[in-house]
Amino acid sequence: LFLHYMVLSWQIVRFQLKETFAIAYGNYTYREALIITLQKNESKGYGECTSIDYYHISLVDFEVILSKIKSQIEKQSIIHPTEFYAFLLQLDLPSFLRSALDCAYWDLFGKLEKKPFLELNKIDFTNLPESSITISVDTVENQIKKIEKSAWTKFKVKCNHFDEMDIIKLLQLDKSLALDSNGSFTKENCYWLENNEVVSKFAYLEQPMKPGSDNYKVLHTNKFANWMADEDCQSLSVLKKLQPHYRSINIKLVKCGGLTPAMEMIAIAKELNYKIMIGCMTESTIGISAGAALAPFCDYADLDGANLIANDIAKGSQIINGKIHLSESNGLGIKLR
């Protein structure tokens, strides 16, 4: 059956987590994700976005939007993904949903062209950062036990309050650690952190305070802390403004709207001398395979999402004990299990 047009379908999937995921925003035992499929003839491309309450993301709302735009999307002929992205921009979609569609289209396009994403974009993938694994909010003793037992070598430690002694204990470990407080620190905490030389041992300190320039204006790039913007860095437009305050940024495909805008954002961030991390939500191999394709451009990677899920539904690029194994199959190399 040869079709002149694409077929768009979707489903909501519940991922059980291997263990409770505890961060400053709350505790989670599962995550729900919207999985998008774009099909032409025998080829299928896949994209994913996760339900995140602190970003006010409702997958049911997304389903309503998809029902409304289904026929417009299906009418598109196969054009270059950057042109498809320009079409998506006209639909005025939430960034999470635009990202799932953009990634699904890149995956489909590569499969139709019989070329991997890395080849389509002439990406040299000889140098890959190693991914961190997330250590949930817990007592510092339990966090240290988990770190010491792990086969991974890089760790992102989540915390929901500031404790000087905890920080000293963590830094006594001979491990590569980053600290992510998901906005739970105060200005005073940040002053202590950026003026304390021992803090330079952290690879980075992510989103120390709640987002907004009232908070981040007290952060300085020329002190000991390598501050990294997450919620403060949603799009290209803020990169210049964040420059005096954040040395590093966390780029997540769902935040910026997909692979297409992420590549543009990475290019501009590099010109502005930012250190760049490719990040993820708690997502399956579908979302992780898309993020991993941009790891060659980045200084840091936080792509452990699929490693936290008990019932992954796809195969593609893999993160094994932090090492990124990029799929060399066509598109993003995603196949459903």
Feature annotation, model-predicted:
Residues 111-112, 293-297:
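Alpha-helix C-terminal capping segments
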